[in-house]
Amino acid sequence: MNRKNIAKGKLVRRFGINIFEQPKYDKLLKKKPNPPGMHGRSRRAKITEYGKQLIEKQKVKFTYGISERQLTNIFKEARRQHGVTGDNLLALLERRIDNVVYRAGFAISRAHARQIVSHGIIMLNGRRVTIPSITLRANDIIQVKEKDSLKKLVRSNIEKTSTLRKLPTWIEVNADDLNVKITRPPSRDEIPTLANEQMIVEYYSKRA
């Protein structure tokens, strides 16, 4: 196991949840349910409210593979929008182009999806893009660049992930033409619960 996998494994154990949504980490949590450095029935130290908020924020950062600055900016945008700030925050994260590539099964992980976008393999509304943080809107269409080797790679990824991941209802995936259409923004109940978004809102609200 390489250093990157070890680091991810430690994060999963620290948070007690499979934030990377990959089967091998479910197995790890079953085998080692305690956080790194804690063995047996040792009691966790009492966590402050701030500590709890920080943990939830970190879950989201590592889940989506974004920086502190990126998450801060996404929170500010979520707060400007109408509706519930926490719901808006998660919807914005889900509509990142790298996340949609991941959700569609075009990539085996979000890190892989970021790489695919960064390398210019994905087209957005007919134009090549290389920025993983682009936020997609309703009726946007992404597709794989016209190159046989790239299409072969993506089709292989779709096959690998088809039994592991359920396609979101707010996107339409054409596996034959390798394109994805955003039909609408996701609602809160369509987004997997990996963190308590209200605690994240409270964390940033105190620092605004």
From Swiss-Prot:
State what protein this is by name: Small ribosomal subunit protein uS4
Task: Supply the Pfam families for this chain.
Answer: Ribosomal_S4, S4
Q: Which SUPFAM superfamilies match?
A: Alpha-L RNA-binding motif (SSF55174)
Q: Does the keyword Ribonucleoprotein apply?
A: yes
| Its job | One of the primary rRNA binding proteins, it binds directly to 16S rRNA where it nucleates assembly of the body of the 30S subunit. With S5 and S12 plays an important role in translational accuracy.
State any GO BP term from the record: ribosomal small subunit biogenesis
Q: Which family does it belong to?
A: Belongs to the universal ribosomal protein uS4 family.
- The scientific name of the source species is Borrelia hermsii (strain HS1 / DAH)
GO MF term set = rRNA binding; structural constituent of ribosome
Subunit composition and interactions = Part of the 30S ribosomal subunit. Contacts protein S5. The interaction surface between S4 and S5 is involved in control of translational fidelity.
Q: Does the keyword Ribosomal protein apply?
A: yes
Q: Which residues form the S4 RNA-binding domain?
A: 95-157
**Which GO cellular component term is one of those annotated?**
small ribosomal subunit
Instruction: Kindly give the CDD domains that the UniProt entry links to this protein.
Output: S4
The entry's keywords: Ribonucleoprotein, Ribosomal protein, RNA-binding, rRNA-binding
